[in-house]
Amino acid sequence: MDKNFYNESSAKNLGWDPTWFGEKYYDDQLIRAIKKWQRERGLTADGLCGPATFRRIWTERQANIDAYKPKDVKYSNYIVYNGKFHKIEWPKVVLWSEKGGLQADKGTYYNYTGRAKRNVRLFVNHWDVCLNSESCMSILNKRGISVHFLIDNDGTIYQTLDMQHGAWHAGSAKVNRASVGVEISNAYYPKYQDWYKRNGFGERPIIHGARVHGKELEPFTGFYPVQIKALKALWRTIHNSTEVEYATPLSQFGTTSKNYEQDVKYGKFNGFISHYHVSKNKIDCAGLDIKTLLEEVVDEESRGFVDIGESCKDE
């Protein structure tokens, strides 16, 4: 592989340049600079600014920008599936067509307009390793991929395209065609706690001892409580509007599986999953106890109780 050619093409497609790594040209010095940057952050030091490296350096650069401002948006009470509106019990939902909405670019998803209603059997949970949902949407569009929903730091749910379309979010055409996905905003690395505090979100919980694919992860930032409440509201509406069942892959002990599950990827499962359930190379959303959260959703439904979160009330 011609690494100089790769980096120049990557820069053109994703929107970075050599100065991000302290260099001027697409040459061997840039390759060495990228390798050094990658090694310092525990990434594979190949000297190529691919999607993973780009996402990391993008987020680091965003953290140094103090011009963050909350979006001025128009809230809705619905999500959209095959052109039909389905009510969601959550006060902060923004559709791609509304003021302040975030939209997946054309050509970044399977467009099923005019076709029979898509059969959705999986809901895939991701974390975005970004500082906020707007930044995540920018990266997705730059990379030519997509996701149906984003959940921001304050619990705002953004829908970026109709669920009738197949978003490119799970790395597998088989999974993408049968699923809906969400990117939950979380920069993952504890060093970003200062950014969250500086911008009024407060500290995130730190997750210790989480395991995935048989390995224990280093401590990382977890989701805000309001994000979990938004996620549960979204799950409830997904279940009621699609064929997705209240189920998740389980371990031999009856707990949420922490491993890749082949049956899920190859169509033998219907329910709510984390990205790592369908990819051995992914760790999101480690620590997310889907089984327990689904039990809470079912219990709340049986009692007619909807928890919209303290930060969402009276707004």
Language-model features and meaning:
Residues D2-K12, I65, L161, A286, ...:
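Catalytic-site microenvironment of enzymes
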Residues E60, K69-Y81, Y188, Y192-E315:
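Basic/polar, cationic surfaces and motifs that engage anionic cell-wall
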